């Protein structure tokens, strides 16, 4: 047993014998966890509680962490040394020699490299359409120079652009896309495909909003400050419909069930624990201009309709304005964007079942 292991085992024995120290360390670990999650008020209370139980809890915790880190480093070094010795043993074994009949003929050229570029482009286009995932482009390009050269062809990106029009990622006709190609993108289909703003259907957009709120206390010198975190969720569908949801629930609990098929998402009396805070999702419609300006319209109540005006910037939706419209008087009321943060797209693989659009990486 090494010196570090001896020290660590002695420290752990001391902790196990001291009940108060063990309790203080548990409070200290909970405080660190709360601080990482952003619950500053809760973490401060747990830090105070830990120091009340045992005044040296911080130094003991740091000493234990340091010893555990040293132990892990020693174990990794031992594993690396064992692996290197095993490699040396394998390399010392003589490899079998090939006979003349078994020798490898390195001059054989794969048949696919003999194909003309036009035929290869047709094959690649059909394969990628069947896979429904353009992320495979980079993997295919890395296989050989022939594929890398073929994937630079502008005609291939033209078919991708037509596919984007068919999948409603651009709410434009093919004719208007071709006109825009000449006016803005120097007749380069590749430039148009890579730079033109598009909507995404294979995931959802998430906005993480935070603000500080003063708390209450019996004494003025010890007034707590709460960090409030809530999330805005937005999911688009190819038929110009969308789901809007605002909640304090984290993405891990919401995203997998964020679908029109989930009826509990739209019911305020839902028994589902992840939607039990009284918030319900709202269905609305979305539209996007050729320049990437997006409008999200959804009814907040029988009296008011909310409108989110956003600008598409890659995987982000930047806020332009947020206002409500009175359904009877058409009076508009601007809402401040103080706490609102940009939506960021997050891909969700389970969304492919009810989204028929071409997936983008």
Swiss-Prot record:
Species this chain originates from: Schizosaccharomyces pombe (strain 972 / ATCC 24843)
GO CC terms of this entry: cytoplasm; cytosol; SCF ubiquitin ligase complex
Principal subcellular localization: cytoplasm
Highest taxon of the lineage: Eukaryota
Ranges that cross the membrane: none
Keywords from the named record: Cytoplasm, Ubl conjugation pathway
Gene name, Swiss-Prot/TrEMBL: pof7
Protein name listed in UniProt: F-box protein pof7
SUPFAM superfamilies: F-box domain (SSF81383)
Localization per record: Cytoplasm
GO biological process: SCF-dependent proteasomal ubiquitin-dependent protein catabolic process
PANTHER family: F-BOX ONLY PROTEIN 48 (PTHR12874:SF9), F-BOX ONLY PROTEIN 48-RELATED (PTHR12874)
Domain F-box: from-to ranges: 105-157
Subunit-structure text: Interacts with skp1.
MF term (GO), any: ubiquitin-like ligase-substrate adaptor activity
Pfam families (UniProt xref): F-box-like (PF12937), FBO_C (PF19270)
């Amino acid at each position: 047993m090494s010196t570090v292991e001896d020290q660590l085992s002695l420290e752990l024995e001391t902790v196990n014998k001291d009940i108060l120290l063990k309790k203080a360390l548990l409070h200290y670990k909970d405080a660190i966890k709360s601080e990482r999650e952003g619950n500053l008020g809760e973490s401060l209370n747990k830090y105070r509680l830990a120091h009340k139980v045992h005044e040296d809890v911080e130094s003991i915790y740091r000493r234990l962490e340091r010893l555990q880190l040293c132990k892990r480093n020693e174990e990794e070094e031992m594993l690396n040394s064992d692996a290197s010795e095993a490699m040396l043993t394998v390399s010392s074994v003589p490899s079998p020699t090939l006979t003349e009949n078994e020798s490898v003929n390195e001059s054989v050229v794969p048949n696919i490299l003999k194909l003309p570029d036009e035929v290869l482009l047709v094959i690649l286009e059909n394969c990628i359409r069947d896979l429904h995932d353009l992320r495979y482009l980079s993997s295919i390009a890395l296989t050989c120079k022939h594929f890398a050269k073929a994937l630079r062809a502008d005609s291939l990106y033209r078919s991708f652009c037509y596919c984007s029009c068919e999948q409603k990622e651009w709410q434009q006709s093919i004719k208007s896309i071709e006109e825009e190609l000449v006016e803005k993108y120097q007749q380069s289909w590749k430039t148009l495909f890579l730079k033109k703003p598009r909507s995404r259907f294979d995931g959802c957009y998430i906005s993480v909003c935070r603000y500080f709120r003063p708390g209450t206390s019996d004494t003025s010198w010890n007034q707590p400050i709460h960090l409030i975190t809530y999330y805005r969720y937005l999911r688009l569908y190819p038929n110009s419909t969308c789901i809007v949801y605002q909640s304090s629930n984290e993405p891990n609990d919401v995203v997998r069930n964020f679908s029109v098929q989930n009826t509990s998402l739209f019911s305020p009396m839902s028994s589902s624990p992840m939607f039990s805070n009284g918030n319900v999702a709202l269905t609305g419609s979305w539209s996007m201009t050729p320049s990437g300006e997006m409008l999200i319209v959804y009814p907040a109540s029988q009296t008011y309709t909310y409108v989110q005006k956003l600008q598409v910037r890659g995987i982000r939706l930047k806020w332009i304005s947020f206002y409500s419209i009175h359904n009877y008087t058409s009076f508009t009321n601007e809402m401040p964007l103080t706490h609102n943060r940009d939506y960021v797209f997050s891909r969700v693989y389970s969304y492919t079942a009810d989204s028929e659009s071409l997936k983008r990486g």
